[in-house]
């Protein structure tokens, strides 16, 4: 048994024996710590032990040759379970850069399986020892109590994308622990009030916000978003407020537990397409020093491919890298009980070692069928910076969903009044069946969104025609140029009453459209109270008021906040919007598309009015049908609209009419009954009606 193991050797003054080769990383076992790491091309591996926060190791333990099986080194070091220490590795091997092999035994190498990383003392502070990352062994014990995961159906998801720091860092957030996991915990009552049922956190794996630190016009710029990962198994220590236990992940676990207790799932934005090591000029602290030519896609002359736009690309379908990614996701699911993952630039995960797209990528298939990941939500950003665009065609095995970029682009254009878009907009609202039905995936594969961290906020989408990214320091050349936005008559903030009134209506139109569309829905934190980034559509480096949520706007735009709450509650109440698999008893189709004339879908070039009716069996009133009609008039003038006829005994009641501001939400005891099924819709407005029995 493990507890009966005895030392067999003494290395570097420590009692040791060959370790358990199946325990990746550093693991506390009875009597000591088990260290395991892999390298194909190294000829020598040395374990480095440091006293806390020391720059240089106090012990070097070279793995004896007998402690290596295949390409795996493993050693159990006795006594380390009783002392406080940090560790790293050193690898020696050939230096043949033309082949991508670049060993340097002088470099301290971070364990890729490290569960906690030492190197920075807090957010915005440079590394204590530049270029040096060390790891700690963590106590993973945590009492989850009787808490269970919500396990929500995919179609019911209303996802709230947030940045851990930006969500509460501004003083207006009113929380004690600003910019941390604990700060989000303090806002759980707010999330419950809003009604969302999933949070998607932008990257929380350990990253170095100082990695691209620079000054521009007396403004400090950081790697704020966190898409340059340093360590994939460790939470970002800067997001933790509990400095006593900040290397054990307890604060994140407490957040996940309390979100689950409130029926809210947790989705992580993960970045397996590249790392923080960059290109040939980038830092050297992990994969480069272990097996550079294994972990990264390299050209025939040893240079880095750059399909990520960030300097390097992980060689995801190489078996060793594939196993690493699987191990990582399994760890987050089992240790932190994460409910789902959104994969940044996921199309890279389907390329082979020279970048060629694969029909059935082994990694994506493994993730789809892995038993531990079964039931975990897998969401792809189905494109990359190398020009591969796979929305509607991402390899899925009926397990993968996609951020539907077509939904964002088509509906942004349609809602602002562009022509030739009625058919496309109708397809997007009704689950993008033109994209997903041919592969038998259904609308659950379409994660619908109009805003996310990339691009304008919803308020800015109707306040700016052009991006305003000068503060990023690239002379306004960064960020997308084609935003499909419309400033409603003035660029940026204005005192013009009519323009501001129109902007609010457009915001409500957009969100009502999202909530009345089939497929999981996602929106950006702060959209519910008109948060602004002042026209910056690429705030990746802005750790300031540009990217922090301004909570004073919640009171200023209370009507928008209340509208968001109402539409979220409406979507939850009428399940036929999200689940149209059951036909109505009256034999109406589950989904039907209309123009301003009922039962007639016209897609003329100048058509800017769409009506969608959902029909199905009511879950609350047994034996009865329910009907929801959503109409959007993107034209700038009134349009007379005819709603579909209903079965005998039913009539239409109007619930929402953004053309009737400020009373755009109609209280149920004051619902307008459309006896003749007609309404003169105002320009640039939406209506929502419910077919009810009388």
What is the meaning of each model-derived region?
Residues 48, 98-103, 171-175, 203, ...:
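Short, solvent-exposed loop/turn and secondary-structure capping segments
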Residues 114-117, 337, 353-354, 359-525, ...:
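Conserved alpha/beta catalytic core and glycan-binding cleft of carbohydrate-active enzymes
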Residues 163-182, 186-338, 345-369, 435:
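Substrate-binding/active-site clefts of carbohydrate-active enzymes
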Residues 171-185, 464-469, 663-675:
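Short, polar loop/linker segments at the starts of domains and inter-domain junctions
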């Amino acid at each position: 048994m493990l507890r009966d193991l005895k030392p067999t050797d003494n290395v570097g003054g420590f009692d040791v024996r060959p370790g358990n080769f199946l325990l990746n990383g550093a693991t506390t076992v009875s009597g000591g710590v088990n260290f395991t790491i892999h390298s194909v091309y190294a000829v020598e591996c040395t374990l480095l032990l440091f006293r806390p926060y020391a720059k240089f190791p106090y012990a070097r333990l070279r793995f004896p040759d007998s402690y290596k099986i295949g390409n795996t080194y493993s050693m159990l070091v006795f006594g380390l379970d009783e002392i406080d220490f940090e560790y790293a590795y050193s690898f020696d091997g050939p230096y043949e850069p033309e082949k991508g092999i670049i060993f340097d035994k002088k470099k301290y190498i971070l364990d890729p399986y490290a569960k906690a990383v030492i190197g920075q003392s807090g957010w915005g502070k440079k590394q204590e020892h530049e270029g040096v990352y060390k790891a700690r062994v963590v106590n993973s014990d945590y009492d989850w109590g009787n808490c269970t995961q919500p396990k929500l159906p995919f179609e019911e998801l209303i996802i709230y994308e947030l940045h851990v720091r930006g969500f509460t860092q501004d003083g207006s957030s009113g929380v004690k622990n600003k910019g941390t996991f604990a700060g989000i915990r303090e806002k759980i009552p707010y999330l419950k009030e809003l009604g969302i049922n999933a949070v998607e956190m932008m990257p929380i794996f350990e990253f170095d916000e100082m990695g691209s630190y620079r000054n521009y016009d007396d403004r400090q710029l950081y790697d704020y978003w966190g898409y340059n990962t340093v360590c994939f198994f460790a939470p970002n220590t800067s997001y933790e407020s509990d400095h006593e236990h900040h290397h054990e992940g307890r604060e994140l676990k407490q957040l996940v537990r309390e979100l689950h207790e409130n029926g809210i799932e947790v989705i992580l934005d993960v970045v397996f397409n590249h790392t923080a090591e960059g290109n040939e000029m980038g830092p050297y602290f992990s994969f480069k020093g272990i097996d550079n030519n294994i972990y990264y896609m390299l050209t025939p002359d040893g240079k880095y491919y750059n399909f990520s736009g960030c300097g390097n690309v992980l060689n995801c379908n190489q078996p060793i890298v594939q196993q690493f990614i699987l191990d990582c996701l399994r760890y987050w699911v089992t240790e932190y009980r994460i409910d789902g993952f959104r994969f940044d630039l996921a199309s890279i995960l389907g390329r082979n070692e020279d970048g060629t797209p694969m029909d059935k990528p082994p990694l994506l298939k493994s993730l789809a069928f892995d038993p531990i990941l079964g039931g975990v939500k897998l969401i792809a950003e189905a494109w990359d910076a190398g020009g591969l665009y796979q929305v509607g065609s991402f390899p899925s095995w009926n397990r993968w969903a996609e951020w539907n970029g077509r939904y964002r682009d088509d509906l942004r254009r349609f809602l602002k009044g562009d022509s030739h878009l009625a058919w496309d907009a109708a397809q997007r609202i009704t689950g993008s069946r033109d994209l997903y039905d041919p592969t038998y995936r259904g609308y659950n594969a379409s994660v619908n969104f109009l805003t996310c961290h990339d691009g304008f906020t919803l308020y800015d989408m109707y306040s700016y025609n052009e991006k305003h990214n000068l503060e990023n320091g690239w002379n306004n050349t960064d960020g997308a140029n084609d935003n499909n936005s419309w400033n409603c008559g003035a660029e940026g903030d204005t005192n013009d009453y009519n323009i501001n009134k129109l902007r609010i209506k457009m915001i409500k139109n957009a969100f009502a459209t999202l909530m009345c569309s089939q497929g999981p829905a996602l929106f950006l934190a702060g959209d519910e109270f008109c948060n602004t980034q002042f026209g910056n559509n690429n705030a990746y480096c802005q750790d300031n008021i540009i990217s922090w949520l301004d909570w004073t706007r919640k009171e200023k735009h209370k009507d928008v906040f209340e509208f968001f709450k109402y539409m979220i509650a409406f979507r939850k109440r009428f399940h036929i919007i999200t689940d149209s698999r059951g036909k109505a008893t009256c034999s109406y189709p589950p989904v039907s598309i209309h123009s301003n004339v009922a039962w007639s879908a016209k897609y003329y070039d100048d058509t800017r009015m769409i009506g969608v009716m959902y029909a199905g069996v009511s879950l609350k009133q047994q034996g009865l049908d329910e009907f929801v009609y959503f109409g959007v008039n993107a034209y700038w003038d009134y349009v007379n609209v005819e709603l579909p006829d209903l079965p005998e005994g039913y009539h239409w009641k109007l619930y929402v009419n953004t053309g009737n501001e400020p009373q755009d939400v109609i209280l149920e005891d004051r619902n307008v009954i459309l006896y003749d099924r007609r309404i003169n819709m105002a320009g640039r407005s939406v209506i929502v009606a419910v077919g009810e029995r009388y």
